[in-house]
């Protein structure tokens, strides 16, 4: 419970989580896991290989579930006038999207582009807020429909992944 609270304590939304070791000798401060790995699938694969060096991507399957991403298209004329605050705000989206995309790209290469690897992630519409603290019913309904649309869009890949998962050799 404490670890999940720490890993999801998004900066400026939730306070950091102070977690004690089992023997209560050390206390650590944990913040949003996305600061380290916005798409932790690649880190999970590396950790898996560390503990299972005899197994390879062809012997495993990975389903990576994203939390959605904001599409950011840069306009050079607009960005030329940005100051530090705007770059800091927009830069956080750019950085998190780039890191998540890079992890997805690398895992596609490791898994040789299917069927053992599948990432589901959706893009927020430009006119929709992607704010984590938006709990308006209209926005929550939008998120549900966004999730349903990504499943519909990727239904074929989901079916192939599921068939591969239950296959017996």
Where are these regions (language model features)?
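Conserved catalytic cores and adjacent C-terminal regulatory segments
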Residues: 1-169
């Amino acid at each position: 419970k404490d670890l999940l609270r720490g890993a999801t304590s998004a900066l400026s939304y939730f306070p950091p989580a102070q977690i004690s070791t089992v023997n209560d000798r050390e206390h650590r401060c944990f913040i949003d896991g996305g600061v380290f790995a916005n798409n932790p699938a690649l880190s999970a694969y590396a950790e898996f290989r560390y503990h299972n060096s005899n197994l390879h991507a062809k012997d495993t399957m990975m389903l990576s579930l994203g939390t959605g991403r904001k599409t950011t298209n840069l306009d050079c004329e607009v960005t030329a006038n940005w100051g530090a605050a705007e770059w800091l705000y927009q830069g956080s989206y750019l950085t998190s999207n780039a890191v998540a995309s890079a992890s997805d790209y690398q895992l596609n290469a490791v898994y040789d582009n299917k069927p053992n690897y599948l990432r589901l992630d959706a893009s927020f519409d430009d006119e929709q807020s992607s704010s984590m603290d938006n709990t308006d019913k209209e926005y929550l309904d939008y998120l549900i429909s966004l999730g349903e649309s990504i499943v519909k869009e990727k239904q074929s890949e989901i079916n192939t992944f599921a068939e591969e998962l239950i296959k017996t050799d």
